[in-house]
Structures are given as C-alpha cells and as structure tokens.
Amino acid sequence: MDQPQTLNEMALQGRERLFPSLTNPNWLVLRERRKIFARWLAQLPMRELDVLDVGGRVQPYRELMANRIRRYIGVDVQVTPLVDAVARAEQLPLGDATFDLVICTQVLQYIAEPSLVFAEIRRVLKPGGALLLSVPSAGLIDGVEERWRFLPAGLRYLLADFGIVEVVAEGSSVVGLFRTLNVCLDLFARLPAARFIYRRSLAPLVNLSGALAEKISGGRNQQFAVNYSVLAKK
C-alpha cells in the first residue's frame, strides 16, 4: 500500500491507529495500546516533553501528549510532511541526552539489529527519560523486510541497559485469538469489494465478540498475546 503523502491523509491514518474504527481488524490491540500508552504518559513527571518519534512518519500517539509537547521530532527512512530527519533508527543524527521521551511503535520487526536501535535510543534519552515501545509477538507477515517477533523475556534482555522495564500484553490470549481470526479473514477477502463487505459486516462482530470474551474471561491468560507495549526508563 502506498504511504500517505499529504498531511490530511496522514492525519486520517494516525487517527485510525489511535482511535480505531470497529471495521479495523486490529481494533482489539490498537485500543489496548492507546490505554496503556495514555496511562504511562500520565505517570511521567515532566510537565513539558522533548519527544523523539522513531519511525514517525504518521505520529498517531502525538495527540496523547499534545498539551505537554515542547519539541517533537519525527525520524524515519521515508519522507513525509511530518518527518524532520530522514535517517535509520540505528544511526540517529541527534545529540546525546536530548529527549525526555522516545516513541517507537511497530518498527523493530523490520530492523536487522534491534540492539543497535536500543543503544541509540538510550544515548539520546536524558537521565530519567523514557521509551514507549510497541512490538508484535505473533501475526501475519507484513512485507518481505520483516525479520523479528518479540517475547517478554527477549525484550527484557535487549533492554537490560535500561533501569526500569515494564512489558505489558496488548490484550490476553482471547484478544490474540479474535484479532488473529479477524486479520486472517480480512486477508482471505482478497478482492477490494469482498474486503469492503467483510470489514463492514463481520469484522465489527468479531471485534465486539473478542471484547466481550475478554471481559468474561478476565484476561488472565497471556500465552497467545499478539502484541506488547513496553515502558523502559533510562
């Protein structure tokens, strides 16, 4: 799919990630990520934030801290109107200890050496600064460049140089099951017309069924969590 090129197109895409519609096959995990990130952001002590968005071509989570931003820098390998610096995450063209917060969502699965990215993020964070991260642990392959899936123990190992690391599943195994069902059915609806019909008929039903099943189950089992959010503090 072509990347959005206008601010309006990117705003729509970012809004869909932050406040996904019921027709979105990823609705279950995206809404959980928003709640997790909002909670962590509320816990940060800084009144004003210097923010770096690694992979920030769309910047969906910028709205969560809109009233606290002092400076917001987007870095990506692709040019968009929101990107301030075109660079790889392994080589950030930024000074040491210059950011209170780094955001990096659904990027690391494409990086050959994630440890290099974490080292760079830690370098540019101020003492006491925080990283908000999201990564997949299961799901469809999204293009030929994907290399990795991540689990809690592996994430803690990669982030061992950070002082505090909290890993939270974006929903339980129940969410993982219903989200996987939704994205697989969406994949099989190959024709645009079939996908349009699916997303406006069955996809909302699968999403709502997953949310209800999650509530009934209590969300305790996380063996099939399909995505994780991470808070790491320097």
Name each model feature, range by range:
Residues 104-107:
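A short beta-strand submotif of the Rossmann-like class I SAM-dependent methyltransferase core
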Residues 49, 96-98, 128-129:
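Surface-exposed loop/turn positions
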Residues 1-92, 101, 223-228:
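Conserved N-terminal segment of class I S-adenosyl-L-methionine
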Residues 115-116, 120, 126, 130-233:
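S-adenosyl-L-methionine-dependent methyltransferase catalytic module, highlighting the catalytic core
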